[in-house]
């Protein structure tokens, strides 16, 4: 009997582009002045996504959104399940006081990574507002976390990997 896992592509390149564009337009609509917005990508795929969203917003509005990165590993409540050698440096490109900070991640699942990211972010100051943007929301929340911007809802089974 084979233990091979089936792989299924959930988003094509075109789907990914559409999701990023939709999230970008929603950010522009919900934030009257995008100059007060800072995108903070969760290491590592969230950083890539935050950069793509920033580029798309710039293409639409001719305004730059600062992008930072955040490694929330040390703030996780399940550290015993991870073999963390060293956390990456978090870089927040500006003072976050009175800014709308949007945490960006690729997949939202239990909510634990986002909870840790919020805790890590608050070490840099107190933003005016924290919002959440995710490419994929797969459900199965263990914490009361809800994204403000979603590229695509993809219900999964608890055991599946995305």
Regions found by a protein language model. Give the residues of each.
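PRPP-associated nucleotide enzymes
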Residues: 1-162
């Amino acid at each position: 009997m084979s233990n091979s896992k089936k792989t299924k592509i959930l988003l094509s390149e075109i789907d990914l582009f559409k999701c990023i564009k939709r999230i970008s337009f929603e950010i522009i609509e919900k934030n009257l002045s995008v100059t007060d917005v800072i995108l903070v990508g969760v290491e590592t795929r969230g950083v890539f996504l935050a950069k793509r969203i920033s580029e798309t917003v710039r293409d639409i509005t001719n305004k730059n959104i600062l992008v930072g990165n955040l490694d929330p590993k040390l703030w996780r409540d399940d550290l015993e399940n991870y073999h963390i050698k060293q956390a990456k440096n978090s870089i927040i490109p500006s003072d976050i006081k009175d800014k709308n900070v949007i945490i960006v991640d690729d997949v939202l699942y239990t909510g634990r990574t986002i909870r840790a990211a919020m805790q890590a972010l608050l070490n840099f100051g107190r933003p005016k507002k924290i919002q959440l943007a995710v490419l994929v929301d797969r459900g199965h929340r263990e914490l009361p976390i809800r994204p403000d911007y979603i590229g695509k809802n993809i219900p999964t089974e608890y055991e599946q990997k995305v």
